[in-house]
Design a protein with these regions (language model features):
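Short, exposed coil/turn segments at beta-strand boundaries within extracellular/luminal domains
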Residues: 69, 94-101, 260-262
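Bacterial Sec-dependent N-terminal signal peptides
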Residues: 1-40, 95-104, 108-122, 272-274
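Surface-exposed, flexible coil segments in extracellular/virion-facing regions
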Residues: 60-78
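Contiguous, well-ordered beta-strand patches that form the walls/edges
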Residues: 160-243
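Edge beta-strand at a domain terminus
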Residues: 194-202, 227, 245-274
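Solvent-exposed segments in extracellular or luminal domains encompassing
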Residues: 72-94
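A short beta-strand segment in extracellular, disulfide-stabilized domains
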Residues: 46-56
Length: 274
């Protein structure tokens, strides 16, 4: 049985009083993870295909397999690149939520995944790729016109000034080892790192001739990924203006900006090895 709590709130006008009415049923027992009955099996030929099967009576699973989440009790999922993965299980039992996890290894890549070259440009797949400021530019960070400029063109901040802001030596690493991982190695902005999170890219063009898609980050950001004019709010959504083996150029409009030539911020990076 599931606990049910019903509150009936009765308020008298100008008085503000309320009377809670509570109806309870005793909850059932918590099923411990040691009692779970489930299997996670690699396909014997293509081990990037996983078969998930929960056979635990009266327990519902949610499976987080790094590339997505499924609430199907029996499902087939694909692990996109080789690596060691931790499958995280959130189980709803009669007495509450119980967590469990299992580690699996994948040795083959899903041939249908990450076919666009931009994924390799950005992350070098599972091996990872580290980016730093592009110090060959007059100013690799600053602001300019949204959907107009292709680099900082109003306030252009050079490497000396970036060092003065405490972000000149920061680094960020993208990789596809067990997920879409982004690690920011930061001295202080938005906080002292490393700050680990995830990322995704969408290669749908927003404005023809200006961008090539979008980059989204979760629980982390890029180097100096803040809106300086908006209380240093962390930026998690970027337009990709250029992405190849040697350059990554990003832009993000200030909150509320949608029109051409509104204020936007720009970031210009190069691979660390370059």
């Amino acid at each position: 049985m599931k606990k049910r709590i019903l509150y009936l709130l009765t308020a008298a006008l100008m008085i503000g009083a309320c009377t809670p009415i509570e109806i309870r049923e005793e909850s059932g027992p918590i099923v411990p993870a040691s009692a779970f009955e489930y299997t996670i099996t690699n396909d014997p030929v293509n081990d990037y295909i996983l078969y998930l099967d929960n056979q635990t009576p009266e327990v519902m699973f949610s499976w987080d397999y790094a590339w997505g989440v499924t609430r199907q009790q029996k499902d087939t999922v694909r692990m996109l690149v080789p690596g060691t993965y931790t499958i995280k299980i959130t189980a709803l039992t009669a007495g509450g939520i119980v967590n469990d996890e299992k580690t699996i290894t994948v040795t083959k890549a899903d041939p249908t995944a990450f076919q666009e070259p931009e994924w390799e440009y950005l992350s070098n797949k599972a091996a990872g790729k580290t980016w730093i400021w592009d110090d060959t530019q007059p100013g690799p960070w600053g602001n300019g016109g949204f959907k107009g400029c292709n680099a900082p063109c109003w306030w252009v901040v050079n490497m000396t000034d970036l060092a003065g802001r405490g972000v000149g030596s920061d680094e960020m690493t993208f990789d596809l080892n067990g997920g879409r991982n982004l690690t920011l190695k930061s001295a202080s902005v938005p906080s002292a790192g490393p700050i680990k999170g995830t990322f995704d890219i969408d290669l749908t063009v927003f404005k023809e001739g200006w961008d090539v898609g979008t980059l989204t980050t979760t629980n982390t950001t890029v180097i100096n990924g803040i809106y300086t004019n908006n209380s240093n709010a962390v930026v998690e959504n970027f337009y990709i203006l250029k992405l190849d083996e040697d350059e990554l150029v990003l832009s993000s409009p200030e909150p509320g900006v949608t029109g051409d030539w509104g204020t936007a911020w720009f970031w210009m990076f190069k691979p660390k090895s370059k």
